[in-house]
A protein has these predicted regions:
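Receiver (REC) domain switch/output surface
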Residues: 3-6, 10-15, 20-40, 67, ...
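Short, polar loop motifs at secondary-structure junctions
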Residues: 83-87, 159-164
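Conserved acidic segment of CheY-like receiver
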Residues: 48-59, 64-89, 99-101
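Short acidic, S/G/P-rich loop/turn micro-motifs used as interaction or catalytic elements
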Residues: 23, 57-61, 106-107, 126-132, ...
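Terminal, compositionally biased segments used for targeting/anchoring and flexible tails
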Residues: 162-290
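A short, hydrophobic beta-strand element within the central beta-sheet of small alpha/beta folds
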Residues: 1-3, 14-18, 55, 122-124, ...
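Acidic, metal-coordinating helix/loop segments flanking the phosphotransfer/catalytic sites
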Residues: 79-121, 129-131
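Acidic catalytic/metal-coordinating carboxylates
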Residues: 104, 132-141
């Protein structure tokens, strides 16, 4: 079944979802509404990260949104399980990345401009409305613009047409085929590898791996042995802050990481700021094994 977006008046209906038997959709709808209501306050006060999903198909929104929230919540719960009291548990849940949905080029651009300093990643379809008409190149144009302005933000381009893979690689952006039988697993892999939900992999500028940390404890342990070139490589690309933000680690020390990253000439300040993040997490009762 295909629903024509023009059949619905957005003044009366915020968004259309399609029930396919997945009970997680109901919770995802509630979380989506909460994120839209709280994102302005949470980004301003706590620098909470934002994921923008650009999709106009109710069917795919209804399929993908529960998966996205499930990945984020599972990461947050893995941290909260070791909390000492309810206060850090509540803080961690409030500090999880927010997911915002856009169904048109103009709305996606508006969200991007508004929350650009807090972006964790962008997931976009290829074909959706632009200037009031369905544009087969809207997703390509949007991601290309975002890559030019914020080159370090991970981009995911999904489409039902395999021919778009080459165009996505030219941006560059990760490409996933909507018709893939393992689409959900591939999206989970994107979260793990590109959005900071997996291990922090230390690499040299040439791509050679020199270390790996699964949690804050391991990050603190291996930092003294990581080559300066690797630390500066990641710091200048805001990889540390992105990885920590994905885990809802929002200490005051983290606020200094962007400034350190942009003009880093020595690895010691970056090491100190990153280690301070784990010390802060330990003080508030969060698990260093997150």
């Amino acid at each position: 079944m295909r629903l024509d977006p023009q059949c619905f008046n957005e003044d009366c209906i915020n968004r259309v979802f399609i029930w396919s038997g997945n009970a997680d959709l109901l919770l995802a709808i509630i979380k989506s509404v909460e994120d839209a209501m709280n994102v302005a306050y949470d980004t301003e006060r706590a620098r909470v990260r934002v994921i923008i999903m650009v999709e106009d198909s109710p069917l795919y929104i209804s399929s993908l949104l529960p998966l996205l929230y499930k990945e984020i919540v599972s990461q947050t719960q893995a941290v909260m399980e070791e909390s000492l009291n309810e206060e850090p548990r509540f803080f961690r849940m409030r500090a999880r990345p927010k997911i915002l949905i856009a169904s048109t080029y103009e709305k996606a651009l508006e969200l991007y401009r508004t929350f650009q300093p807090y972006l964790l990643g962008i997931l976009s379809d290829v074909r959706f409305p632009r200037n009031g008409r369905l544009d087969p190149d809207a997703g390509y144009a949007l991601l290309k613009l975002m890559k030019e302005e914020t080159p370090d933000v991970p981009l995911l381009n999904f489409s039902s047409e395999e021919s778009n893979r080459e165009r996505a690689s030219a941006i560059p952006a990760v490409f996933l085929n909507k018709n893939s039988p393992i689409l959900h697993e591939e999206i989970r892999g994107f979260f793990q590898k590109h959005l900071g939900f997996g291990d922090f992999v230390f690499r040299l500028p040439d791509g050679h791996e020199v270390g790996r940390a699964a949690n804050l404890r391991q990050l603190e342990t291996i930092l003294p042995d990581i080559p300066k070139e690797s630390i500066l490589y990641h710091a200048r690309r805001n990889h540390f802050s992105g990885w920590l933000m994905a885990r809802s680690v929002l200490p005051r020390a983290l606020l200094s990481l962007p400034a350190i990253s942009s003009a880093a000439t020595a690895a010691r300040p970056v090491r100190g700021a990153a280690i301070a993040c784990r010390c802060w997490a330990r003080r508030v009762g969060a698990s260093p094994d997150a």
